[in-house]
């Protein structure tokens, strides 16, 4: 993505795992060319600083937590400031599914594409703050 991407392009990374300096470095290097990377915070109810690539930080790296329809922090979402940049809808999201179907699912992998879409539309702004963020520093809700 970094080698082929252009400034203004957006990459969605809905993946996660334990801490990996190699993964973090790859995201930081790839984002240095201007591609915006939207990273899922993870679904472990844990500090996102313990998970890669969510803990990667840089000017073009945006880590996304999840909220419900009432702007409440999702019980499963990872947290932490840094690395969390924005919160987006991630609870009970209707999405495409296997074999051409649809399913209603929850996770930061649902929230992160919302944020990527906002960046593709040309920029993000603060739509308020999420309620009940476990780190005590309420994440801003991304909006266009």
Annotate each PLM feature.
Residues 3-15, 20-26, 33-35, 60-63, ...:
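C-terminal subdomain of the subtilisin-like protease fold in secreted/lumenal serine endopeptidases
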Residues 14, 44, 109:
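Catalytic nucleophile serine of serine hydrolases
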Residues 15, 41, 66:
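A cross-domain feature marking catalytic cores of carbohydrate-active enzymes
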Residues 18-20, 44-48:
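Active-site environment of divalent metal-dependent phosphoester hydrolases
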Residues 24-28, 50-54:
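Short amphipathic alpha-helical segments and helix-helix/interface helices
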Residues 35, 51-124, 140-143:
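Extracellular S/T/G-rich loop segment that most often corresponds to the catalytic His/Ser-adjacent loop
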């Amino acid at each position: 993505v970094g080698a082929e991407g252009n400034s203004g392009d957006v990459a969605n990374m809905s993946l996660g795992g334990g801490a990996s300096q190699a993964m973090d470095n790859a995201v930081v290097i790839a984002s240095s060319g201007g591609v915006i990377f939207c990273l899922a915070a993870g679904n472990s109810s844990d500090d996102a600083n313990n998970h890669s690539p969510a803990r990667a930080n840089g000017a073009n790296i945006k880590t996304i937590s999840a909220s419900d329809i009432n702007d409440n922090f999702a019980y499963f979402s990872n947290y932490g400031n840094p690395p969390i940049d924005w919160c987006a809808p991630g609870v009970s999201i209707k999405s495409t599914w296997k074999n051409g179907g649809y399913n209603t699912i929850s996770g930061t992998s649902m929230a992160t594409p919302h944020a990527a879409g906002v960046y593709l539309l040309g920029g993000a702004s603060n739509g308020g703050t999420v309620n009940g963020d476990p780190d005590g520093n309420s994440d801003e809700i991304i909006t266009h």
